[in-house]
């Protein structure tokens, strides 16, 4: 029997990126996974043509031994989110895990190159639309998904909510300005505080709320950016990790009977890899990304 067989998960933002890796790892562990996000085979695609759909991810979840259920959901539209969780309740009768990896930061730019060229400029020389893209398809998306998930979990007296973040350093795990992206930093700081406060209110109901800090992930968009050896060297691509690494961290948390002890904290994926004994897709242990420590 697989460790998460019979468990029900919703992964928000899993057509690509960290969310896709999380969905696949949950599938490896045997979970029923609602693969959700804005990009489906039938429907609009991102402006920068980033690959991936909820349908593709769901099919791979099933192929890996779980059950993938694709649902197109725009997490900036509350009615769509409410309908998703009502469907989960109707079809499964419970929800064990919510993993949120929604991120609309790329929506403010016409292409991957445009995003990279904007990085490092002062905020007044970057598109003001970033605020809406990153705060709405970011902090609000995490809130509204958690809102409906927590209702189901509180009624059951248990559950796990996981979020993905960026912009923390060192053992103190305190938010710090990353340099070159004011709205990016603000959006992630908002997510961090949101998750910490949700943890306080969720703990009496045995709902663990945990934030994960990955290293430099090989997402589809990152791979679109890394076009030259010079750029790979600049970003220390040799220290990057697949999105399955953070996925295995979520699967480990979901299988941990003492997970409530970790609630309200930001955890490095690398630390959980040590604790739970998992590696990246290629068998390597990837340490905490040194660029995070040096910022």
Could you say what each language-model-derived stretch is?
Residues 26, 94, 158-161, 192-219, ...:
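Conserved Rossmann-fold SDR core element
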Residues 5, 64-67, 87-107, 119, ...:
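A glycine-rich helix->loop->beta "capping" turn
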Residues 211, 230-295:
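C-terminal helical subdomain
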Residues 104-108, 115-130, 134, 143, ...:
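Catalytic loop of short-chain dehydrogenase/reductase
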Residues 3-40:
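Canonical Rossmann dinucleotide-binding motif of NAD(H)/NADP(H)-dependent dehydrogenases/reductases
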Residues 51-52, 72-84, 128:
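The beta1-alpha1 cofactor-binding region of Rossmann-like NAD(H)/NADP(H)-dependent oxidoreductases
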Residues 59-78:
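Rossmann-fold cofactor-recognition segment
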